[in-house]
Amino acid sequence: MPARAQVSEAILLAEGQKSAVTEYYLNHGKWPENNDSAGVASASTIKGKYVQSVTVANGVVTAQMKSDGVNKEIKGKKLSLWAKRQDGSVKWFCGQPVKRDNADDPNDAVKDDADANGKISTKHLP
């Protein structure tokens, strides 16, 4: 199966956490620190045929692909969804794995996740 089709599962599973993360932010004024505070299942429970886990960390939702049974170009690699405040609403982004050091960063700053086990090439992102 093409890597792009397998990556779409990761995006779908990660997107499933967006409403909980957004709701937490709107209620608390900061991003949820982890899956539990976001009110979603544990990272290892949010999985699929090709996805090993989906983690919420300081409002960044990161999906990690499995290390076997997936296209070799994406084995064990990650992608992230993250939000920023914009004009009174929350705008979401998707791409390479990132992290946010502080759940209540006033600038919603994110940076490349240097600890990420490889990045999914943009050619595989829908």
What does each model-found stretch correspond to?
Residues M1-T22:
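Amphipathic alpha-helical segments typified by the pilin-like N-terminal helix
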Residues L26-P126:
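Periplasmic/extracellular, small/polar-rich flexible segments of pilin-like filament-forming proteins
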